């Protein structure tokens, strides 16, 4: 496949030190670029639009750009968006990812229509990202579950389904 899993993880500041050794850390996890690449190749059309309501790190956006997919991701933390922009500039995908800062419950209304909704949401309080009351990782489990499912419903509302018949043009398009 693309063959940049290890290098992207290193640039992301994730699991590997600069010399390639595994880092022993309690930091937040880094999304595996190989899983991301496979998901995009299998489930998102070329030049398709990916929507990510819980963007976090840069991996999903950079891999989308490297594969020619459009990417729109949302994260609450300005420092995370800034770090993602720096990493995207260093790696320079052919299609630049778009990251917006804000609560996905508010920003998804302005997101483009999606061909593929793909994310890695917080795991309740397993990894805590901030003390922002809108941060799912800072919520009680009950509040987390309610907010998580609401965000997923909003993200899914941004996708468009297409049906194509074997010998004709596109037959239907529906939200």
Segments predicted by a language model, with ranges:
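Class I S-adenosyl-L-methionine-dependent methyltransferase catalytic core
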Residues: 1-175
